[in-house]
Amino acid sequence: MTTPTLDLAIITGLSGAGRSTAAKCLEDLGWFVVDNLPPALLSTMAELGHRSGGAVSRIGVVVDVRGRAFFSDLRAAIAALDARGMHPRMLFLEASDDALIRRFDHVRRPHPLQGDERVVDGIGRERALLAELRGEADLVLDTTDLNVHELRSKIDAAFGQPGANRLNATVVSFGYKYGLPLDADLVADCRFLPNPHWVEELRPYTGRDPQVRSYVLAQPGAQEFLDQYAALLRLVGEGYAREGKRYLTLAVGCTGGKHRSVAMAEQLGARLAADGVGVRVVHRDLGRE
């Protein structure tokens, strides 16, 4: 039996350069992230990952090596992992002195190495201490001019998997008489279409049934609505992707959540899937009557 491959990433760098943000980005990509792990425990963490049988295949570790002893421990831990055939990738985050000073001023906290001196003194001390480690990093990111979304994009490019950045949409049909879904990002109202409930031969069926679906889609404005709303969702989806938002809940409503909203939700879900969006269609109120 083949042992599952373990991907190990070490996040380190200057205080205030974005280590915590980078860790959150890895978590959003599905990594198991441990903050401020002592370097001496890296091998133990890697072993636990191997023993998980693939349940934990990507581990990110935020390492603080401001102490000289921790610096030596980190180099020894990486050497031990290399000897076992595991080659962790190291991400080093840095920023300009001006940017770091502004960030510490914004959070109103002292630099951990400034002591009784100024923030800039602590930054200089840490920069000198970590200079050698920076030279050994696999990837150095300067976050001086990066906002959170731009940093996320760079982390995605370096550590994401194919398809990890795609938008995932949950399309929820619902009945207005039961209330709007609380988690909806966007709401589409299909009550402008004639209600199949008032067509006696269609009343027992739902929007999943072909006779109701055909009736709804044949109504004036139905296809135009689908075309224009799908175009809107493409635009919104692209914007969400740029902003690092990967999950969208689209609510599609009619009076009772049985006919029109169900048929239209199925159609919108199919169009989103054709555009490469991960889609799950849920009919919240189907069967409530």
UniProtKB/Swiss-Prot annotation:
Please state what the protein is called. Nucleotide-binding protein FRAAL4592
Which purpose does this protein serve, as stated in its record? Displays ATPase and GTPase activities.
Family stated for the protein in its record: Belongs to the RapZ-like family.
Keyword annotations for this protein, in alphabetical order, are: ATP-binding, GTP-binding, Nucleotide-binding
Q: Which domain of life is it from?
A: Bacteria
Residues binding ATP: 13-20
Mind telling me which SUPFAM superfamilies this protein's record contains? P-loop containing nucleoside triphosphate hydrolases (SSF52540)
Give GO terms: molecular function aspect only: ATP binding; GTP binding
Binding locations of GTP: 64-67
Lineage, highest ranks first: Bacteria, Bacillati, Actinomycetota, Actinomycetes, Frankiales
InterPro entries (UniProt xref) = P-loop_NTPase, RapZ-like, RapZ-like_N, RapZ_C
Name the species this protein comes from: Frankia alni (strain DSM 45986 / CECT 9034 / ACN14a)
Question: Which Pfam families does the UniProt record give?
Answer: PapZ_C, RapZ-like_N
